[in-house]
Amino acid sequence: NKGLNVFGLIIDMIWSSLRYGSSFVDYFNFRFYEKDHQKRRAYATMGFMYRYHREINDQKKIREVDSKELFPHRFGAWCNKSYVFTKDDIDQFNHFLLSKVGQKIVFKDPNSTAGKSIKIVSVTKKENLIYLGNQHLKDFLNQEFALKHSIYCEDFIIQHNSIQAISPSGVNTIRIISMVTKEKTVVIIAALFRISVNCPIDNYSAGNLAAEIDPVTGIVLKGGIRKRSACDDYHDFHPITKMPIRGFEIPFWDETIVMIKEAAMIVPEVRSIGWDVAITNTGPILIEGNSQWNKDTFQIPAGYGKKDVLLRYI
């Protein structure tokens, strides 16, 4: 569509991989085909980020942040309620589900990333039988325990009314990237508003939008854009609800930043963490942390490379 020569494009992709450490996906997501050398070298690419995460974070401590099962124990003061059930806990699981009839539950695979394993189901009771979505409880258990030894789930989060108005299809979270400096202070190096587009999850890799937030004010600076930015442009308004994205002020922003700065010092050896935060009508909730946070969300919404931001703290 941009009139580029295919052969020349392929050669440039290979050259960029060797010169900048970019993957072929990076080449298109960062729109290298329309950028000169100076702009390309400003990006934190796949090769750079692999080295960066290993150097900046203590690899012996990252499980305390990344594990969905350990996370509530380390960061429980700010977390959404979570539960783990094994085959020996079937009775407890039944009682738990009975207490959730008429509500939704979020099931996750503790070892999965990018929202690939998330299932949001409604709990119902019909003729004294419990159903999870359209699936009978017995069938659900047989399916789950055939693949793993335990079930991990969380309470469904009811997001803030103003965020719900922008996109009601999923819980729209805030990604905040923190950095513990060598002087043991915490700085916020990026904040992004992740916005679902007719999707039950808001993960960037699922075709949703992300928009850059001013870390100081909590105001969205630009419209949202998809990860495959080569096929998209900025959306100042939500594609479906038509509610404004650019200029939106995230509720409870000051409280959110205080929470993140406190949480970042729980495991300070993991210096750089990408936090996922949900905003409810009563305040922020910490969902999870990621020691190998995604470079795409960090840079694509901004429209330029931010490698220099990361180099300041090595």
What is the meaning of each model-derived region?
Residues 115, 173, 194-200, 290-300:
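Glycine-rich phosphate/pyrophosphate-binding beta-alpha loops
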Residues 132-226:
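Phosphate-binding site of ATP-dependent enzymes
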Residues 105, 187-189, 285-287:
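Protein kinase-like catalytic core scaffold
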Residues 1-98, 113, 260:
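Conserved N-proximal alpha/beta basic substrate-recognition cap immediately N-terminal to
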Residues 219-239:
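A glycine-rich, aromatic-flanked flexible loop/lid motif
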Residues 81-82, 105-135:
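Glycine-rich phosphate-binding loop of ATP-grasp-fold ATP-dependent ligases
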Residues 232-272, 279-314:
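C-terminal active-site "lid" helix and adjoining low-complexity regulatory extension at the edge
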Residues 109-111, 125, 155-157, 178-180, ...:
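Short, flexible loop/turn elements at secondary-structure junctions
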